[in-house]
C-alpha cells in the first residue's frame, strides 16, 4: 500500500486529534463525519452540508491542508469507518483511490443525474477526478493560482505587472522596504511550497518528471528555476518559510507585502472590510510566463463508511448544486457550465477575468499518486536551497535521488 509519509511531529499531532475523527464509541449514533481542508469557499460548503438533509447531523471538521491530509491518511489507512465524507483535491485524490480508500460515484451519479443537474459539470472538470474510467469526487471548485499585486502602489510608482520572472524580481526589489516586503512567498512544506515550486519548475523549466516518472527538476533548467526563486525570496515577508496560504492571505490583507502568487479562492478576502486593510487596492493578472498551478477540489465518500451511500451522496450533491455554487461564486471559479457562462457573475466578481486567464495558462500538478509523498522531501530540500543552507544543485540532486529511491520502492521503473 502506498502511504503518505508523516513527520514525527505530524504523527503526534494527528494521533492526539484522531479520536474526534476516528469516532469509535464516542461517535454519536447516526452522525455523519466530514473532514476537509479550510478556506472561505470550503467553509461555505461545510455549512451547506450541515443543512443539506433536515434531521441528519453532519459534523464538519476543517483545517489547513497538510493537517487534513495527515488526519485523513491516518483514518483511511486504518480502515476506520469515519470520516464518511472526505475532502479531495485533483492531486491528492489519486493517492486515496490507488489505496482503495474512496468509493466510486458512478452509480450514484447516474441515479441522481437529473435531480441535481449533474450534466452541468463539463467532462473537462469531471476528468480531473476520474481514475481508470471511474469518477470518485463530486467537483465543488475550480481554482487557479493568480498573480496578486498592489495596484495602488504600482500606479503611484508608474509600474505595470511583470511579464517575466526577471521583471518580477526587479519589481520586488524596488518595492521592498522595512514597511512591507516586495514579495509574498508561501514556502511552508508541503502543499504551499509545492504550489510555488510548481510554477517555477514549469514556467522556467520542463516540470517535475519525464514521461516515465524519472525526476527532471534537478536538470539545468530546474536549477536555474530555483536559483530565481532564491533571488526573489530575498524580498519576501518575514517567516515565509513557515507561511502557507492562510499566512500569505493575511500578509496581503494587513499590508505586509506587495505582490506574489496566490489562489483565486483567496481573492475575495482582499476586499473584506472586516479583515482587510487594503480593500480595493489589490488587483490580479495571470502569473508571469504562465504555468502556475490550476486544478480543483471537491468531496468523496469513504470506502469504509457504514453510512447510507445515498444519504452521503445527497449531502455532497446538495452542497454542489447550482444554487449552492452560485452562492459561493465570489469565492471560487464555478465548476458548472451554467455558472461559468453567467455574465452577471462575471461582472459581479472583479477577479474573474484574471482567474479565468490564469486557469487557461495554468498547469496541473503531476498525476502521480505518490506526488505529495515525494513532495515532502523535495520541498524541504528546496527550502535548504532557498535559505542558503545547501547549494541549489546539491539540494535538487539530493531530492531527485530520494524521489527515485522512494518511487522505485513503490513499484516504479520496472
Model-identified regions with their sequence ranges:
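C-terminal lobe and pocket-closing loops
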Residues: 264-278, 288-381, 412-414
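Extracytoplasmic/periplasmic solute-binding protein
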Residues: 131-140, 145, 166-215, 257
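N-terminal secretory signal peptides and thylakoid transit peptides that target proteins
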Residues: 1-16
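Glycine-centered hinge/linker elements that transmit conformational signals in sensory
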Residues: 171-176, 212-241
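Hinge/lid segment of periplasmic solute-binding proteins
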Residues: 91-144, 169, 196, 279-283, ...
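Extracytoplasmic "Venus flytrap"/periplasmic binding protein-like
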Residues: 51-120, 152, 156-163, 251, ...
Amino acid at each position: 500500500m502506498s502511504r503518505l509519509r508523516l513527520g514525527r511531529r505530524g504523527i503526534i499531532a494527528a494521533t492526539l486529534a484522531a479520536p474526534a475523527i476516528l469516532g469509535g464509541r464516542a461517535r454519536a449514533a447516526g452522525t455523519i463525519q466530514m473532514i476537509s481542508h479550510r478556506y472561505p469557499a470550503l467553509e461555505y460548503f461545510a455549512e451547506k452540508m450541515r443543512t443539506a438533509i433536515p434531521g441528519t447531523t453532519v459534523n464538519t471538521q476543517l483545517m489547513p491542508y497538510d493537517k487534513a491530509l495527515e488526519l485523513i491518511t491516518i483514518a483511511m489507512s486504518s480502515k476506520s469507518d469515519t470520516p464518511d465524507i472526505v475532502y479531495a483535491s485533483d492531486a491528492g485524490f489519486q493517492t486515496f483511490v490507488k489505496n482503495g480508500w474512496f468509493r466510486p460515484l458512478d452509480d450514484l451519479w447516474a441515479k441522481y443525474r437529473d435531480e441535481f443537474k449533474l450534466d452541468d459539470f463539463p467532462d473537462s472538470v469531471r476528468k480531473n477526478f476520474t481514475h481508470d474510467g471511474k469518477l470518485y469526487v463530486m467537483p465543488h471548485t475550480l481554482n487557479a493560482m493568480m498573480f496578486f499585486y498592489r495596484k495602488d502602489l504600482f500606479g503611484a510608482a508608474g509600474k505595470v505587472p511583470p511579464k517575466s520572472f526577471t521583471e518580477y524580481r526587479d519589481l520586488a526589489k524596488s518595492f521592498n522596504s522595512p514597511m512591507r516586503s516586495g514579495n509574498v512567498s508561501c514556502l511552508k512544506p508541503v502543499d504551499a511550497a509545492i504550489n510555488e515550486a510548481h510554477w517555477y519548475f514549469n514556467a522556467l523549466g520542463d516540470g517535475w518528471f519525464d514521461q516515465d516518472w524519472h525526476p527532471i527538476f534537478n536538470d539545468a533548467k530546474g536549477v536555474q528555476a530555483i536559483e530565481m526563486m532564491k533571488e526573489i525570496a530575498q524580498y519576501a515577508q518575514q517567516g515565509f518559510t513557515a507561511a502557507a496560504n492562510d499566512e500569505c492571505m493575511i500578509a496581503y490583507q494587513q499590508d505586509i507585502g506587495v505582490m506574489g502568487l496566490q489562489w483565486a479562492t483567496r481573492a475575495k478576502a482582499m476586499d473584506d472590510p472586516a479583515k482587510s486593510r487594503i480593500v480595493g487596492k489589490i488587483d490580479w493578472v495571470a502569473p508571469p510566463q504562465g504555468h502556475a498551478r490550476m486544478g480543483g477540489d471537491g468531496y468523496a465518500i469513504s470506502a469504509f463508511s457504514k453510512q447510507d451511500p445515498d444519504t452521503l451522496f445527497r449531502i455532497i450533491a446538495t452542497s454542489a448544486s447550482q444554487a449552492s455554487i452560485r452562492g459561493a461564486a465570489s469565492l471560487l471559479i464555478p465548476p458548472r457550465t451554467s455558472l461559468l457562462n453567467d455574465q452577471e457573475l462575471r461582472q459581479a466578481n472583479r477577479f474573474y477575468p484574471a482567474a479565468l486567464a490564469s486557469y487557461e495558462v495554468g498547469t496541473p500538478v503531476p498525476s502521480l499518486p505518490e506526488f505529495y509523498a515525494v513532495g515532502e522531501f523535495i520541498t524541504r530540500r528546496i527550502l535548504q536551497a532557498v535559505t542558503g543552507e545547501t547549494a541549489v544543485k546539491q539540494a535538487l540532486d539530493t531530492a531527485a535521488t530520494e524521489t527515485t529511491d522512494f518511487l522505485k520502492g513503490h513499484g516504479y521503473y520496472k
